[in-house]
Amino acid sequence: MHGLLLAAGLLSLPLHVLAHPQPSTSTSLAGRAGAVDLNEFRVAHRSSYTSHDEMKKLPSIASFRQGTYLEVATELVKQTMPNMEFRLVDDHYVGDSGIGHVRFRQTMHGIDIDNSDFNVNVGKDGKVLSHGNSFYTGPAPSSNPMVKRDFIDPMQALHGVRKALNLPIKADGAHVEDMSEHKVMFKGTSGALSDPTAKLCYMAKEDGSLALTWRVETDIGDNWLLSYMDAKESSKVHNVVDYVAHATFQVYKWGLADPTEGKREILTNPWNLKTSPLTWLSDGQNNYTATRGNNAIAQYNPDGGSDYENNYRPSPKNLKFEYPYSPDMNPPKTYIDASVTELFYTSNVCHDLYYMLGFNEKAGNFQVNNRGQGGKGNDFVILNAQDGSGTNNANFATPPDGQPGRMRAYIWTRANPPRDASFEAGTIIHEYTHGLSNRLCGGPANSRCLNAIESGGMGEGWGDFYATAVRLKPNDTRKTNYVKGGWVNNSPKGVRMYPYSTDMNVNPLVYTSNNKLNEVHAIGTVWCTMLYEVLWNLIDKHGKNDGPVPIFENGVPNDGKYLAMKIVMDGMAIQPCNPNFVQARDAILDADMNLTKGANKCEIWKGFAKRGLGVGAKFDPKNRTGSTQVPNECK
C-alpha cells in the first residue's frame, strides 16, 4: 500500500497501494491483529540495466536497425537472450519524447514467469537507447506442468493465502469460474471488494530456482494484493505485491501545499483543454454536475466501503463548487463539500500537468474515455474524501491500465480540530504520483515493478519530489528547505526524517544511508533528497518557471524545474522492472541524453554524486558502496 504515513502495520508491502508516511517500524498487513510482516514477502532485486553509454560499447547491437521499433526491440531480445521463450506485452507505445517503450514477458511451457521481464527503449533514430532485463536464466522445469497437472487447485491456493496472510476473506461455499486457460475467478466469497482471481504462473526465486505458483489477487480495500502461493505447497507464499496513488471551484490554488501557504480562491474552468478536452465534468458520453468526469470521481466515503458510485458528492446549481471551509471548522463532515471539491481539483490538475509531461493515454494514464489516443480506458481515479477506513494517512491503489486507480484521503487527528488530508495538496500529489510511477515503471500493463525494498522506496521518493517541485515559490533558492506533511501532521518536522535541503548540515542523507534503512518511506527520503539536488542544479542552469504549466521549446521544457520533472518522469519509463538507485540514476541520464542530447549530464551527475551516487557507486542490498566522483568531463 502506498501511503503518506505508515498506517499501523502497513508499510512494508511491495508497494502498490501507496501511503504517505513518516518513519515507522510497523510493517504488518493493514494493522490487523495477528497480521504478518509483509517485508518477508518482498521480491528481490533481479534486474540489470544497460545504459546508453554501455550500449555504445556494443556496436553490433547498438547499431542494429531494421523496420519498426517493435521489430528492433524484438530482435534485440532474440540476440541478447537466444533460445529464450517470451511474449510481447501489449502495452508498447512511443512516448512524447520520441522513445519507443517495448516490454516482453518470459514464458516457460507457455506459462508466464511473472517477475521475468525485458524492457527495450528505442530512440528517435530507430536504434536501441537502453534496455533492462530480469529474465530467468536458471534450469528449466523438465516437463510441462499442464500435462500431469500435479499442482494444487486454485481454491486450495485461495484458502492458503487467506490463512497465511490472515486475510478477512471467507470462501466457504465459493466456486471457481474459468476466465482463460491459466486464470480463474472465485465466485461466492465475502470480505473482498471484488471477486478474487487466481492465475497459474512461475516465479523466479532469489536462490536462482523457479517456482510454479498461483497468483491470487485479492482487493480488501486498504490492501490490493497479488500473493504468489506455491502450486505444490498450499502453505508456502513466495512473494506478495500490493497495488495499494463553465464551472467555478473554490479551492487552494495549485502551488499551495497546504492552508498555511495562502487563501482559497474561486477559479473558473480551471481545466486545460489541451490535456482534458472533455473538461473535468464530462467523459464524452455524459456531462456531470457533480465531482465526476473523465479523469476522476470524488465522493464522501465515511464508512470506508467500496460502493463509491452511490456515495454522496456535491452537485451544486449552476456548477458553482463554492463551499465554506476553514481549518478551525469541526467536525470534518460539516465541510465535506469543500473537501470533496478540493480533492477533485488537485487530482485533476495532477492529471493535466502529468499529461503535458508525458503521462498520456499511451503511457497508461487514468481516464474513462481515451478518445482513440491509445491505452486502455475505463480507469479514472476513484477519490474518497474523509475515508472512514483509517486515520492519519492517505493511500493510492494502482492496478494495471484499464482498471480504476483508488485514492483514500483520511482525517488526521494530530491536531485539534482534526485536519483533512484533502486540503494538503502535497499529500494528494504524493499519492497521485504513485499512480504515475507504477504505470510507467514496468509499463501500463504491469503494476508490479516497484516492489523490491529500494524500488519501493523510490516510489515514495518520487511522490515527495513532485509534491515539493510543485510547491516551489518565486523567491525560493537552493537554500530553501521544505518539510513533508507538516500541516496535516501538526508538526514542524513533518513526516520525514529530515527536511528536503541541499545543505548537508540540515539533511545529511547519502546513498549509503540506505544500508541502515529497511522501510520504504525512509529510503524514499534519501531518493527525493538526491532529486532535490538535481532539481536545483537544473534550476541554477536554466532558471525556474513559476507558472502552473511548462513551456516547451522543441519538446523540451525551457526551465530547470519542469525539465527536472520531465526527465525524472521519462526515466521511470526507461528503467527496468524493480530498479535500484544506480539503475534509476542511469535511466535519468539516458532520458536527458534522449531529450537534450546530454546537455545536462554534468548537472545531473553532480547532484547525485553530492549524495554518494556518483561514478563507482554500487548496489548491494546489504552493503551499498557510495561514491562522490563524477565523470572526468564534469570535473
From Swiss-Prot:
Binding positions (Zn(2+)): 430, 434
Propeptide residues, chain positions: 20-246
Cofactor note: Binds 1 zinc ion per subunit.
Glycan-modified residues: 287, 475, 594, 623
InterPro entries associated with the record: FTP_domain (IPR011096), Fungal_virulence_M36 (IPR050371), Peptidase_M36 (IPR001842), Peptidase_M4/M1_CTD_sf (IPR027268)
Function: Secreted metalloproteinase probably acting as a virulence factor.
UniProt similarity note: Belongs to the peptidase M36 family.
Name the record gives this protein: Probable extracellular metalloproteinase 1
The species this protein was found in: Arthroderma benhamiae (strain ATCC MYA-4681 / CBS 112371) (Trichophyton mentagrophytes)
Gene transcribed to yield this protein: MEP1
